[in-house]
Amino acid sequence: MILYKNVDICDLEPIAKNGILSIDECGNNNWDKGKRAENDTSVVYLFSPIGKQNSFPNYGAALLEVQCEAKENKIGKTDTHVDDYIEYITKRVKPSEIKRVIIPKIFKGYISVPKNIEITWCEFKAERYGNNGLEECSDEIIEQFVKTAQLMDSTDFNFFRGVTEKRTMIDLYNIEYIF
């Protein structure tokens, strides 16, 4: 089955070498204390998007497409993404089961990708709050976002948040990686 997982760009090299490992197996627990749901740390979480939003970069700006066996995991009713995707779990994802690493091509000049990692560069769409609620981001807003946002590591302060020229935050919603 084809499933997806967002990961940090800075973690691509060890993922390419070792696959996607559980927190228990790899020791990479980059969740802020008290901000992680009571999820099992001995499994790998994957997703299948329900709507048009197909990437959840709060977990990392690189989207991995994987083909592996996994079982559906019931998401709690209060989970942030309960209406966004179906969650799956597996013990681990082998490197050979990672089919693509997908990153928006507009990020190219602002990130560092290991030379041995093949990237599928994609288009990028998102929405942000404007005067009339959520509205599609203009090309100018997307460019300003990419120039000013931290994109490599989700533990960085203000990760995946841009700043306008007037110094207000650019927060994106309903993010689509178009590939």
Where are these regions (language model features)?
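Short beta-strand element of the conserved SAM-dependent methyltransferase core
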Residues: Y4-V7, A62-C68, E118, L151, ...
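General structural signal for secondary-structure boundaries
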Residues: V7-D11, V93-P95, Q150, D156, ...
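Intrinsically disordered, low-complexity, compositionally biased regions/tails
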Residues: I23, W31, E38, T80, ...
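Surface-exposed flexible segments
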Residues: D11-N28, E72-I89, Y110-C122
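ADP-ribosyltransferase catalytic core
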Residues: C26-K99, I103
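ADP-ribose/NAD+-binding catalytic cleft of ART/PARP-like enzymes
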Residues: M1-S42
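C-terminal, well-folded lobe of enzymatic/effector domains
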Residues: R100-F179
